[in-house]
């Protein structure tokens, strides 16, 4: 089994994997961003919310490449459109603006077991990184993860908006492996969704681990189209697996 071979790197999804979030509110995120501007008095939260809706309507969603790959649009584009049209000025980077918007647009908590898992990975000299279907830039997402998990030790962050391509497209996985100078076979990928995370990782040659918090079995193997993959219902299970085998 590939799970008995020590990986050189373990990569993670973000939403539903590292964090559990509540309902999304663009208005709340934009309100916090307005207060971070040098001239917050020049516009209102209502104006920013209207600009968000206007931009979203113009851009639309579900865009695909000629090869059928769903494409992502960067959050930075939306924030620039909104804040510039509102006349807001900042003395912080766009990545910092992304992080503020992200921090306040929903309730969020770190999923149980994540911090201990990351400490264990680091103690075993296994490298760690992020691959996420995320509108944030890698720089913005890195700031966000560092805010919620100060002790995180990710080597790098790769988001779909960085390269436009989204999971389960194999290219986003192989891009990360190439950047790490690793063979995909030496990498594990952890996520909470079957198609983008498990199917995507397998398609790229990585070893997937699925977090299914609704599973009654703490640790099991599932098979799909003759492909077996590990499923756990708590990150503590992976922590114990790593400590036991490596």
Task: Tell what function each PLM region has.
Residues 1-12, 20-22, 38-46, 109, ...:
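Asp-based, Mg2+/Mn2+-dependent phosphohydrolase catalytic module
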Residues 3-124, 138:
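N-terminal helical cap/lid subdomain that shapes the substrate entry/recognition surface
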